[in-house]
Amino acid sequence: MKFLLDVLLLLPLLIVCSLESFVKLFIPKRRKSVTGEIVLITGAGHGIGRLTAYEFAKLKSKLVLWDINKHGLEETAAKCKGLGAKVHTFVVDCSNREDIYSAAKKVKAEIGDVSILVNNAGVVYTSDLFATQDPQIEKTFEVNVLAHFWTTKAFLPAMMKNNHGHIVTVASAAGHVSVPFLLAYCSSKFAAVGFHKTLTDELAALQITGVKTTCLCPNFVNTGFIKNPSTSLGPTLEPEEVVNRLMHGILTEQKMIFIPSSIAFLTTLERILPERFLAVLKRKISVKFDAVIGYRMKAQ
């Protein structure tokens, strides 16, 4: 009963906050400057990570680029240097905790305190539970989730000490809405979204107001990791479009970025719709891509 009374007493605040949010829709938020900030991007040798590096280079940030692919990393670094940025590269296996901690130690000693951390590195296996090998499941969680813990533990203390920083989690719409035959990937991205939300709340509980958090949750992106993707929610997203939205979200300090925005509506529907209706709705959305179905192979 006391809890219900407390909720009722908060209704005036709910009305004020709702009006405030509505008004903000029509007032563009000022973008912050990232000139001179030390920005570390994991998975910078390809796709979203590479394009994000280009955008920070244009904004005169100092770049620290990590990737397991040395050739891709060097290509990204060369373009960023051509844009006038100072660039440092490290070949890092984000599935290896000790590799992450070792590289982080070098970054802090040789370059300085990272003030913007973009946890972008990721892997995906398009297969059902039976066709996904145990090492693939382990690697999915090591790269897509656990690496976020290790990088954040390495670089967040300095941000908290300075009360200045930004942790960016590149997740997925699959971190909010489940997709068959992406079991390991969806599970890891649900965990990544949970990491972002809980880290945000921990920082608030500790009254660390200067360290911001942003989570990116796009639909299928045309980066080549998933073959022949399609969905009735819209066309496959181009990396440039996603990175433009990501940069806007970082610079305006948005907490959650859904691309397309209809994903946010879908996540709300999933919580309130009857299960039977929701099952029909998911079939209508018609998510398709090339996948290996191990269950059928076992049955043959």
From Swiss-Prot:
Identify the residues that bind NADP(+). 40-64
User: Which EC number(s) does the record attach to this protein?
Assistant: 1.1.1.62
Q: List ligand-binding residues for substrate.
A: 172
Q: What are the UniProt keywords, alphabetically? A: Endoplasmic reticulum, Lipid biosynthesis, Lipid droplet, Lipid metabolism, NADP, Oxidoreductase, Signal, Steroid biosynthesis
Name where it's found.
Endoplasmic reticulum; Lipid droplet
Q: Which residues form the signal peptide?
A: 1-19
Identification of the protein by name: Estradiol 17-beta-dehydrogenase 11
